[in-house]
């Protein structure tokens, strides 16, 4: 594949099904739909941990959370574990970012030669309260949905600023005659809460026309005990009126369209400058969002709504209009980016578990590829681990019963078939895939030991519960509201 630039676009918390090109009945994403028509769309793409910081550390390093030890939103990526950005800087390449990274601090060597308006964790600390899991406190009602509906948030303005700066960056880059490829990473914050969106986007989704809620506990759905314990701690949905729940969905849909519009501006600038001829484009998200399904909001689980992400790649050498069903994950970004810019992986990089999305897109679907995710962060009573291979997804919990879903017969994961004796062989096979990657019990203990040490460092549980943002991370220059 010919070396080219790469424009890597990552949104925040975009549910993998909520794009037009993924067949959603309501959500409008015309710019991403166009990108998918020009390139390859992946239907089985996953985060490696369904919360911001661990997911972004996997993206940066090509390594699993249990390997890097960036367990939760209080342990942000600091560059100690080197990633693809470090490698490309060593090769003399231009590697720059605009927008949300959610690392520890701008002045740390995290693999970017320059950062524009970066969002990092507040005060270099993050959500210390989220490390309190052993045991999980009885409750800590979340403020994630304190704001819902039409309006103008700091996040909306921030995304416009990111698009503005990206368009200017591309214009400047088009004037450079150097043939060496560059990497530009864009980190948008939509559709992450606050669920506030400009009126014109909110009005696209009248609440009386919204699709019905899926797997509603108020209508008979019974949550898995691990998820129920999480909800008892967060207490989000139970404090919303029926109208607020609908408004939250409408606002989330609107944010999907809003971020699509900002991405469209950037893609138009890429074409207007002529850089589209030698630039490949990636679009994905750091994790998903429940958007009310199972009576949950935010992310933090390993169901499709929390762990699956949209993934579209386009450009020279990428099959146009293809739909790829091979399971992939964010840690594949390492090999994907090196592949795009023409850097051969060194001996250590060849041992990483990922593979280039460009190679995968050009191959037949691989039902044998195993994708792994894990969760050890805020609101979870114990570690959770996911294996996706072929038609099945296996979720293993420490201290709770496992789950098995047939994603072909049951794409909404409504029926756990783990206890069916006919599936005993599948259960054993998938648990072995998990144990080939890590020892889940030892990993759970390792995560909690490090989290308990962090809590002790900050004065114990009673003090730590109050340290860190209670909702969304503030944008650059903004104090927590």
Name the predicted role of every residue range.
Residues 1-397, 402, 411-432, 439, ...:
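Formylglycine-dependent sulfatase
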Residues 408:
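Residues forming the ATP-binding cleft of Hanks-type serine/threonine protein kinase domains
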């Amino acid at each position: 594949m010919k070396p080219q630039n790469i424009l890597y676009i990552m949104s925040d918390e975009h549910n993998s099904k909520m794009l037009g090109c993924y067949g959603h009945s309501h959500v409008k994403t015309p710019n991403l739909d166009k990108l998918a028509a020009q390139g390859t769309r992946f239907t089985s793409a996953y985060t490696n941990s369904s919360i911001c910081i661990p997911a972004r550390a996997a993206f940066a390093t090509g390594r699993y959370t249990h390997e890097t030890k960036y367990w939760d939103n209080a342990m942000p990526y600091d560059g100690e574990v080197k990633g693809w950005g470090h490698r490309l800087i060593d090769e003399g390449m231009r590697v720059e970012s605009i927008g949300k990274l959610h690392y520890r601090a701008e002045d740390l060597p995290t693999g970017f030669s320059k950062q524009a308006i970066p969002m990092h964790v507040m005060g270099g600390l993050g959500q210390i309260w989220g490390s309190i899991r052993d045991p999980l406190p009885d409750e800590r009602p979340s403020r994630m949905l304190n704001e819902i509906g039409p309006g103008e948030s700091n996040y909306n303005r921030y995304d416009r600023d990111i698009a503005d700066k990206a368009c200017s960056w591309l214009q400047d880059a088009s004037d450079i005659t150097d043939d060496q490829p560059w990497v530009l990473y864009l980190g948008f914050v939509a559709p992450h809460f606050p669920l506030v969106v400009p009126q014109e986007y909110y009005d696209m989704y009248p609440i009386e026309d919204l699709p019905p809620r899926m797997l509603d506990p108020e209508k008979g759905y019974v949550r898995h005990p691990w998820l129920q314990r999480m909800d008892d701690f967060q207490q989000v949905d139970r404090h919303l009126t029926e109208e607020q729940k609908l408004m939250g969905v409408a606002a989330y849909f609107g944010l999907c369209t809003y971020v699509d519009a900002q991405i469209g501006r950037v893609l138009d600038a890429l074409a207007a400058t002529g850089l589209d001829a030698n630039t490949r484009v990636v679009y994905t998200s750091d994790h998903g969002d429940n958007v009310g399904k199972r009576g949950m909001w935010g992310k933090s689980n390993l169901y499709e709504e929390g762990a699956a992400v949209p993934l579209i790649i386009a450009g020279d050498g990428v099959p146009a209009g293809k739909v790829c069903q091979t399971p992939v994950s964010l840690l594949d970004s390492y090999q994907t980016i090196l592949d795009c810019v023409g850097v051969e992986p060194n001996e250590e990089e060849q041992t990483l578990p990922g593979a280039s999305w460009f190679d995968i897109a050009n191959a037949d679907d691989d039902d044998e590829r195993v994708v792994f995710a894990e969760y050890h962060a805020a609101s979870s009573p114990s570690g959770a681990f996911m294996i996706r291979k072929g038609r099945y997804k296996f979720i293993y919990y420490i201290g709770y019963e496992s789950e098995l879903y047939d994603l072909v017969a049951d794409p909404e994961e409504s029926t756990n078939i783990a206890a069916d004796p006919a599936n005993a062989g599948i259960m054993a096979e998938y648990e072995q895939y998990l144990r080939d990657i890590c020892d889940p019990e030892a990993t759970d203990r390792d995560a909690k030991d490090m989290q308990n040490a962090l809590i002790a460092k900050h004065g114990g549980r009673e003090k730590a519960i109050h340290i860190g943002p209670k909702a969304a991370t503030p944008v650059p220059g903004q104090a927590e509201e």
